[in-house]
Amino acid sequence: MPELPEVETVRAGIANHSLGRPVRAVRVVDARSLRRHLTGPAHFEAALTGRVLRGAYRRGKYLWLTLSEADGTLADEALVVHLGMSGQLLVRDEPGRDLGSDSGNDLQARAAFDEQPRHLRVALELGPAGATGDAVSTNRACTGQRLLFVDQRIFGGMFLSPMVPDVPAVVAVNEAAAGEVSERFLVPEAVKHIARDPLDEFFDPAAVRRKFLRTSSGIKKVLLDQSVISGVGNIYADEALWRARLHYAKPARTLSATQTRELLEAVTQVLRESLAAGGTSFDALYVNVLGESGYFARSLNAYGRAGEPCHRCAEAGRTSLIVREPFQNRSSYRCPHCQRAPRSRQVEGSR
């Protein structure tokens, strides 16, 4: 499943290539990808057509595009995208006209633009970019574009959700004084329950620590709880726990303040490093908007390395092999020397 780095990579791609473009038409190929848009495909198509892609935002694994009305004002709802297990957002730029209509290059480019990807679910036909508000792209392409939602397993989807305020306490007073909540502090109603992620400028480690202290669940289960800390999935949870030398079943409430700080630092470092590498791609299901794979898989220390030497132990002259253990219908990877099991592993969330 795409986690924070993969979704952020897609968000950045949309921000660079698609903002400021009007939606000329919407084609719903498979209505199953609109299961969360309760008013149906016809309403989805009508509500998007004529609006302009204004801003690209993310919280955890959720991505949303704010919209402008024809007069440039901010629309009261946003287009929410969840990639699920295998979702992709792909950008296809319409070829220019400078090569001549009978040019072989022009025909090849047109054929690539018109090609429909396998597992295409929703297609947005976008017009040329133009200045429509504060959060617009610097890419002023004069040709059209297609924004394609492709999803092999159909666990992801798209839907429109009303925008609601979600102002951090540290800025709430200033926002109230201004009399109007700025766009950066508006989120889709469907996303508001999602906790802020470690790359959010208003992420609050102290609040996360308080949540840890209230639960006896294993720490990995808590890391995967998007209402506690968002954006972390199985891969990055295992990687962060390896760096922090913590067993996945250690009860969250037993972590010391130092262990909590080190774990959250490890989570943040892993996410930043993966983001810099374009995310983790184990197969063709995860790509950026241009169809390119990330390469953080080359840097993994625990996840997917069962039977291979622990890098840290090897550096210390020890031999310890990464083990794979069952965890909530999936797997956990750890070093049995660096990440020793707690005295009693029979805690909630350890399996």
Regions found by a protein language model. Name each.
Residues 1-351:
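Structured catalytic/nucleic-acid-binding cores of DNA maintenance enzymes
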